[in-house]
């Protein structure tokens, strides 16, 4: 069955996903150039991500959408199990948002330039001033009423377990007094583990759990600590038992 699934990926999925990636990138760039970035910066990527999951026949379960208020901006924070985190959140969260992502992703052919035109935020860690500029852009996105999705671990897990959370997303939420909404991703590590059989996906169900947002309790260090600790705890408790427990990743 494993080899039949790989043949299906090669013969059916690969051509369709390559074409879809080109069309999505072109639609995003042209749509944003023509002015409606709110629509074109989100929906082509959303349906492209949905297609990735569906064409690979991966079952998806989403829990907790009832926790989200329609007109509220959130700082979403999620564990980073694998490459399919992107497709699961983008395709199934059901919320218009911007990503905070590594600067290196700008170099991905077509996808990188589409993300730039969609005004997703590339985090440049080459120096303090560059990091500050990245967070200034994120601040403006949130001030405009958009939500933001961040992986506070900063890198995909090598084990499926959670690593250390960085404070940046929580500092932004504190500054603008926004709720932080934890997201737990299950199954992504099993579908596409980091640095293993890079050319193939494995069949495994995916699950996205949207936890109850954590409202600010004030402003400053205590609020940052509260939102960060409660987010970490909620995400950890939502993980499958085999992936619960802290493991520090070497590139964090």
Would you name each region that the model predicts?
Residues 24-43, 55, 70-128:
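Catalytic core of membrane glycerolipid acyltransferases/transacylases, capturing the structured
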Residues 52-53, 115, 141, 173:
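A generic structural signal for well-ordered alpha-helical segments
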Residues 63, 100-102, 124-125, 152, ...:
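Thr-Gly-centered strand-to-loop micro-motif
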Residues 58, 120, 178:
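Short glycine/serine/threonine/alanine-rich loop segments
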Residues 4, 132-252:
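Non-catalytic C-terminal accessory region of glycerolipid acyltransferases
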Residues 1-74:
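Membrane-anchoring hydrophobic helices of lipid-metabolizing enzymes
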Residues 62, 76, 99-100, 208-210:
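Generic preference for hydrophobic
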């Amino acid at each position: 069955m494993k080899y039949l699934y790989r043949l299906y990926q090669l013969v059916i999925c690969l051509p369709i996903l390559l074409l879809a990636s080109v069309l999505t990138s072109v639609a995003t760039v042209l749509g944003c150039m023509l002015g409606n970035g709110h629509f074109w910066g989100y929906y082509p990527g959303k349906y492209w991500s949905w297609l990735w999951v569906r064409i690979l026949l991966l079952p998806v379960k989403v829990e907790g959408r009832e926790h989200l208020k329609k007109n509220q901006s959130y700082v979403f924070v999620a564990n980073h199990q694998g490459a399919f985190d992107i497709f699961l959140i983008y395709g199934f969260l059901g919320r218009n948002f911007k990503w905070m992502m590594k600067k290196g992703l700008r170099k991905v052919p077509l996808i990188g330039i589409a993300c730039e035109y969609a005004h997703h935020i590339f985090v440049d860690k080459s120096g303090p001033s560059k990091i500050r500029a990245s967070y200034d852009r994120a601040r403006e996105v949130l001030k405009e009423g958009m939500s933001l999705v961040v992986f506070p671990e900063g890198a995909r897990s090598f084990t499926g377990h959670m690593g250390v959370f960085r404070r940046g997303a929580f500092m932004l939420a504190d500054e603008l007094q926004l709720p932080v909404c934890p997201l737990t991703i299950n199954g992504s590590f099993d579908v596409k583990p980091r640095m293993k059989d890079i050319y193939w996906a494995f069949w495994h169900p995916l699950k996205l759990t949207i936890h109850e947002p954590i409202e600010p309790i004030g402003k400053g260090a205590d609020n940052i600590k509260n939102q960060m600790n409660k987010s970490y705890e909620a995400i950890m408790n939502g993980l499958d038992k085999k992936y619960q427990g802290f493991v520090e990743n070497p590139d964090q």
